[in-house]
Amino acid sequence: MMTGLIWFVQVVHYPLFARIPEEGFTAYERSHANRTGWVVAPIMLVELAAAMLPLALKLPLAPGRTAGTDPLYLSAVGCLLLIWASTFLLQVPLHRILERRHDKQAILLLTATNWIRTLLWSLRLAMLAMLFTECAFA
C-alpha cells in the first residue's frame, strides 16, 4: 500500500509544492501535514507492527525458515527501519521548515530525499514478493 502512495508523492505531490504561491503556502503546508498524518501514520504503524510481530513471536515462514533468521525477511525489516529513520530525520524536519515559511531549497530537498523512501519501499515490496513466492512454493 505504501509503495503506491510513495510513488504518487514522489512523482506528483512533492514536485507540485514548487507551484504553490508563497502567499498561503504555510497554511497549506500545515493543513497538508495534519491531513497526511491522519492517513499515513496508521498505515505505517500497522506495517511496522506486521513486520515486527513475526520477529517477536519467532514465527516460521516455511520449513527451516523463521522470521528472525531469514536474510530476506530481515532485509525487508531493515528497509522499513531505514524508511522510518529517513522519515523522522529528513522529511519531517523539512516539513517543519515548510510549516514556518515557503522555502524553495527545503522543497527541493524534500523531493530529493524522498527518493530514499521511494526506493526503499519499492525494494521492500520486491523482497516481500520474493519471500512470499519462495515460502508459498516451499
Model segments located where?
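Juxtamembrane boundary at the C-terminal end of a transmembrane helix
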Residues: 128-138
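Transmembrane helix-loop-helix
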Residues: 53-80
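Mid-bilayer segments of alpha-helical transmembrane spans in multi-pass integral membrane proteins
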Residues: 81-89
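Internal alpha-helical transmembrane segments of multi-pass membrane proteins, especially GPCRs
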Residues: 34, 38-41, 74-77, 111-118
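Interfacial loop at the N-terminal end of multi-pass membrane proteins
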Residues: 1-46, 96-109
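Core segments of transmembrane alpha-helices
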Residues: 40-54, 117-126
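Hydrophobic residues within membrane-embedded alpha-helical segments of Major Facilitator Superfamily
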Residues: 1, 50, 72, 79-82, ...
